[in-house]
Structures are given as structure tokens and as C-alpha cells.
Amino acid sequence: MKHPSVRVCCFAFASCLLCAGCSLKRLAFSSLSHTLAPFPEGELDAHLSDADFTRVFTEEDDLDLVAQSLPLVLKVYEALHLQNPAHRGLSLAVGRLYIMYANAFVQTPAQYLPEDEFEAQNEAYSRARKLYLRGARYALSSLETAYPGFTREVFSGDEQRLHKVLSRCTRVDVGTLYWVGTGYVAAFALTPLGSALPDTVHAAVMMLERACDLWPSYQEGAVWNVLTKFYAAAPESFGGGMEKAHTAFEHLTRYCSAHDPDHHITYADALCIPLNNRAGFDEALDRALAIDPESVPHNKLLVILSQKRARWLKAHVQDFFLD
């Protein structure tokens, strides 16, 4: 018969092995998380930035392949996030993927549906809105982890508290602010009047504006692009206005690449249509279509999607301008 002290030692040893196994499992998840979704600080590191996981999509020229594979990749990342919910990199990565998918493969195709398919279009818009909000909330949780209480303060409705919590953000947070703000603003654009979401749009725009203050050239002016579209579409009561839209677009043109077709489409869609500027509209779309996707290998997907949008706008020009 084994001595009681031996049994105790065996039990303690087994417990240590179990704890070690749990620790190793956590370590493995943490290591995998860091590899697939570096912390937001990684955007300041050129080496880590070059290893951005979204490159497998942004460098792809087969839209169907991306549309079919992105949901699976998204769910893999979401499963990893369930195992490591406090990982800021994973929170941001899942948020980005939801917002990218909603924009490229839910909302945008719905915009191309004919008028007699308005029910299908509205269903797609409703789905896109939900995905935008889900993505924004995931990305927001990254900021909440970095700054406990961030969500409460940023949506408090108190201007002073909003400015105070945003003042804590640094250049490291610009990417996260961009995706949170973009997700909420995109959802707002698809939100029926009278819903509760407009109450959050002011905070979302403030996050985007804070991102511009901290890093105006981020992603070749990506934040200015979103703000241009928002300012042009939103009434002044929600912080919009054409004067602000034109100012944001000036910043965008300062930072964007000459091989970026999207800023031409933003100009045509957001600035030319409201002012009935048909000549500017046509010229901008022609410039967008003249760009060779192969000249932008790191952003080929965006070029192809943007040019598809440009062709649709040209084909429906009579819907936007008075004769």
C-alpha cells in the first residue's frame, strides 16, 4: 500500500501536468494569435505590416475565389478569438474581415440589382448593416481592452467625455479607430430613419477624425476617403456638409496613390453627382478605368472592385444627372 504522502505527491504531480498542459495550450493559442493577427502596434513596424494577413485577399484578382473563401477564413479567426477574447490583434482582425466582407460581397452587389428586385436589395442591405455592426463591435473591443471603459465613454453622449477618451488614443490605435468608425458609418448609411443607430454616428465620425489627427496619411488617405463620402451624404445635423466633404477630399488627394482608382470614384459619386457635374463625373471614371490592376499588385482586389463600380456608374449615368 502506498504511503499517503506518495499519493499526495502523485496527485500534485498530475495536477502540475494538467496545469502545464493548459498553459501550453494557452501558449499555443497565444503564439498562433500573434502570428495571424499581430497587435495593432504591428502597423508601425514595416516588417509586420508587410506580413498583413489580408494580403492573401487584397492581392487576389479572382473575385469569386475571395467571396467564397473569406467567410471561412473569417470564422476561423472568430473561433480563435473565442479562445483568446482579450487579444487585441484578433479583435481587430475579426472586425476588419466582417467589414470587408459586408462591403465587397454583400452591400456592393446589392447596389447593382435592378429596381424590380428592391426586396432582395433591402434584405441584402439589412444583412450588410448587421455585419458592419458586428465588425465594428469586434474592433471596438480591441480599444476596450487597451483602454478599459472606452466603449462607455465614447458613446456616453457627453462631448467632454468623448474628447477625453479619444485623447488617450495614440498613433498605434489609428487602424482600430479607422475600422470601428468605418463600420459604424457604413451601418449608418444603411440605417432606416428613426432607428437608434444615428445616436452613435457622431462618436464614430469623431473616431475617424481623431485617426486623421494622429496619422493623416494612414493607408494612403483611407480615413479621408471614408470621411469624404460621409460628409457628402450626411446632413449638417449629423456632422456632414459639402464644404467639409471637399476639404476631406483635398486631404485624400494629397495622400492617395496615383494608381488608386477609388479616390476617382469617390469624387465622381460623392462630389460630382450632388453638384450635377457630369463632365467631372465622366473624367473621374475614365481615370479610374485607365488604371492597370497589375500595376498595383498589393491592392489588386480593390482596383478590380473599384473598376467594377466605375463601369456600373457609367452604365447608369442617366439615373444621376439631369439632361
Swiss-Prot record:
Gene3D superfamilies: TRAP transporter T-component (1.25.40.920)
Stated name of the protein: Uncharacterized protein TP_0956
Recorded superkingdom: Bacteria
InterPro entries: TatT, TatT_sf
Naturally occurring in which organism (per UniProt): Treponema pallidum (strain Nichols)
